[in-house]
């Protein structure tokens, strides 16, 4: 329940603040939020959110396992969460950790350390208007989620892999030009892609052709969040 609450806060905060945001949940009761403006149009890009039509039914255990396994690693060091565990100490303890918590927990912890670092680099790239680095980090983070966090599909239903299919299509159309990755908690649902305007028609055709008309939603990132609307405006 607490995990779902934090995830919901992330969605609501992103909408309320606008732009590219960072949220530090070190103190879940008082998260620290940062904001950076981004201008996709300036670089000739749009953002696409594509619905892979997957079902989120029976995925509760998959979502919960990610947190449970990362916390199991932290417990080996007498800590509650991984951010309290020194990364170098984690790597020194790999032989012990593999036996104690299993390999999936270990590689998910590796993803945690790398992705926390990547998030800071991504935010810096946006602030510095380094769009090439921004795209590269989006792709790197997506690969890490797929390969190491292992949340692109549920192992309980390996025949249903809509997210990987959408990612593979995205790579086919955008390789060398844009960026793509799974979105949110993963396992099913949506992916995001940053698409050059000149490739938008081809990208939409590929996604809609696979998942159905209207599956690819073309968006922009609004740099203004929630604003008051009054009758005199």
Where are these regions (language model features)?
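Short, small-residue-biased leader/transition segments that mark boundaries at the very start
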Residues: 2-6
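C-terminal nucleotide
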Residues: 14, 19-181, 193-233
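N-terminal pre-core extensions flanking Radical SAM catalytic domains
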Residues: 188-191
């Amino acid at each position: 329940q607490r995990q779902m609450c934090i995830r919901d806060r992330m969605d609501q905060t992103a909408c309320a603040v606008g732009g590219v945001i960072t949220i530090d949940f070190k103190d879940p009761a008082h998260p620290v939020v940062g904001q950076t403006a981004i201008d996709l149009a300036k670089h000739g890009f749009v953002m696409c959110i594509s619905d892979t039509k997957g079902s989120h039914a029976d995925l509760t255990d998959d979502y919960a396992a990610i947190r449970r396994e990362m916390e199991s690693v932290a417990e080996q060091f007498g800590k509650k969460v991984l951010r309290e565990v020194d990364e170098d100490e984690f790597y020194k303890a790999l032989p012990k950790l593999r036996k104690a918590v299993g390999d999936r927990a270990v590689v998910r912890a590796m993803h945690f350390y790398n992705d926390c670092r990547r998030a800071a680099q991504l935010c810096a790239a946006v602030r510095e208007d380094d769009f090439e680095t921004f795209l590269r980090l989006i792709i790197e983070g997506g690969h890490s989620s797929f390969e190491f966090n292992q949340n692109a599909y549920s192992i309980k239903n390996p025949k249903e892999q809509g997210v990987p299919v959408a990612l593979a299509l995205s790579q086919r159309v955008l390789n060398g030009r844009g960026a793509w990755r799974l979105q949110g908690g993963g396992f099913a649902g949506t992916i995001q892609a940053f698409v050059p305007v000149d490739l938008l028609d081809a990208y939409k055709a590929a996604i809609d052709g696979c998942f159905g008309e209207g599956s690819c939603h073309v968006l922009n990132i609004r740099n203004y969040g929630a604003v008051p609307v009054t009758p005199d405006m």
